[in-house]
């Protein structure tokens, strides 16, 4: 069967534009030519692809199947032409990517200005959220995702690993005490993510490991959200304990607003990946952005261990007691100021 690729591309454009007239205007062709090309395509395939009415067009079942495959072909042709052009002029064009809100705000957004300074011809469209856009269907060029990849058609490049730990503000510890073992968590005020819920019994658990074994400990959250960033205000105000990524908590630890609790226990470690559709040409703009992130992201988990209460206790034993007591007094005062400001 002979095949005219132009007929296929015209069909994709008609579906994209929603009418023959709009497609003709977009392509710079007469409407009669566009209509004839689609008819010739239907004749060659032996199937009607479009429902035609005076006001609109719609896809038949055969048309929907054909369009799904042809849309990918059209997009890959466009990307191939763009890639060849960028070999001459450098990466350029819109780069659409998605990233979870907490990581996007804390780690990705502060780097975008630097990236644009290096690649001024790349325009960035960042989608913050936990919903997964369709990379295969072209809703985004790239996704920055945490955790395992559910779709075998996606490939990933690892940007780093995220370790989760339990954090509390000085004001919380002053008011409610500090848990010394995860068994005590069920008696403490906690802030949890929806993913911590057990779907079978509708109870919440935190998975924690002491290095030799992983156990699930029940918690009774007073607040639940789908992103840890939504719980930051509550943990800073001393309302509860939060199990979150060390890199998300790092700015607050550095400023003394929170500290790690339950020394020796850590939550799950998950990968942070740059994800894109497999089997597709990786455009120079995507490659440039991923290479930049690999170079600039620094998930320094060792820093968090330096803030571990057990390590601070060891420092006191080695003669740093007066300095540490003074620091903790300042942290308690800061915690009170945060709480008073939030409840004023």
From Swiss-Prot:
Residues 20-39 bind DNA. Signal peptide: none annotated. Pfam families: HTH_1, LysR_substrate. Keywords: DNA-binding, Transcription, Transcription regulation, Virulence. Residues 3-60 form the HTH lysR-type domain. One of its GO terms (molecular function) is DNA-binding transcription factor activity. Activity is regulated by cyclic di-GMP. Cyclic di-GMP specifically binds to XC_3703, which inhibits the interaction of the XC_2801-XC_3703 complex with DNA and prevents the transcription of the target genes. CDD domains: PBP2_CrgA_like. Interacts with the cyclic di-GMP effector XC_3703. PANTHER family: HTH-TYPE TRANSCRIPTIONAL REGULATOR, TRANSCRIPTIONAL REGULATOR-RELATED. Belongs to the LysR transcriptional regulatory family. This is HTH-type transcriptional regulator XC_2801.
